[in-house]
């Protein structure tokens, strides 16, 4: 029988601007060295500081989320942006989504030329009539004012080594999903909430595979009636469970607390053979971090002068 998911919550953040960051959850095939663990924790703190700087200046939850995601996408320790996992063809195909509590949403999938995929996701939300766009081109990014980067920028030696190891296995399997995917959720001084998620997918995935991260209601969701959430883990299972929306629905209609709802969602994911975690911030109340007991998760939160990181 599966163990009960592990849940943490902030203490003292209720009613205050707050940010929560995750650096992915799952079963690591390639454990971090102590040095990389330290660097990952430092990067999470930098992301928290960047997001809180926005909130402390009176900025919006959306701007805070994008600022935090930027830091994580630029950090090679995480499977997003610069550190993206590689497909079976040795290319980076990245997915990202951003959503605000009023229902606005933008996402990209299969992005292969966007330096910071979260910027392209925001551009889809703010500069097009669409919600999800696949393989945004350099011309589109230029029109949106979004910075591009060539494939070599994303292809790191460590990721090439991981791909080669997997392809040398008898079954040519793919990596354990989830680890390194990044997400940020925030609540600003006005009580507005937002969520953003960014990922490079899964090492050795087939070209064109899309996980839960860019799917509103699966890996990313925000609703001003309840909460903002970013998920990480076995993407296919989070999609099947409509994890982000399910969390919202359990709080809104079943009357569950965010903590209890998070446990129930992750139990449902595990029943399908998946694992992972999530971070969420309610419109009111304490922020929540949760992950399956079998999964490892990197995360942190910040409010006021408080900074907490865990990995």
Question: Where are the language model's segments positioned?
Answer:
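Alpha/propeptide regions of enzymes that mature by internal proteolysis
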Residues: 2-311
